[in-house]
Structure formats: structure tokens, C-alpha cells
């Protein structure tokens, strides 16, 4: 048992699965994920325009 034979025998990266192998459920799931991501990006854009929601909370006085 030499030191060179140890370790993983299989490759680290798995071969990519082609799009033809995906069934209808996987295609629908990916489409739904894309739509959700678009909605999330739109909401982030709208939220960035309005500014921060903070402003209340505990106010500290300058006295010690």
C-alpha cells in the first residue's frame, strides 16, 4: 500500500446533466424558481427607493 494509491478514485466534478434528461416536473420547478427570483428582484428595487424603515426605537439621551 503506497502513498500514491490512497485518496479518492472518482473525479471530484460530476458530469453535467443535459437538459434533455429533465422531466416536466423539473422544468416546471425551474420556471417557477425563475419567476420567484424576478418578483424578489422587483421587490428589492422598490424597497431600495423608499429608504430605511427604522426611525423609532429606544432613544438614548446624551446625559451620563
From Swiss-Prot:
Chain segments carrying region Disordered: 1-64
Biased composition (Basic and acidic residues): 27-45
Coiled coil: 21-50
Keyword Transmembrane helix: no
Keywords: Coiled coil
Signal peptide segment: none
Composition-biased stretches (Gly residues): 53-64
Pfam families, per database record: TMA7
InterPro entries in the cross-refs: TMA7 (IPR015157)
Transmembrane keyword on record: no
Family: Belongs to the TMA7 family.
Descriptive protein name: Translation machinery-associated protein 7
Amino acid at each position: 500500500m503506497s502513498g500514491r494509491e490512497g485518496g479518492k478514485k472518482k473525479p471530484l466534478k460530476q458530469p453535467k446533466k443535459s437538459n434533455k434528461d429533465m422531466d416536466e416536473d423539473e422544468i416546471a420547478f425551474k420556471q417557477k424558481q425563475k419567476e420567484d427570483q424576478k418578483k424578489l428582484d422587483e421587490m428589492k428595487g422598490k424597497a431600495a427607493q423608499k429608504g430605511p424603515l427604522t426611525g423609532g426605537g429606544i432613544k438614548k439621551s446624551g446625559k451620563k
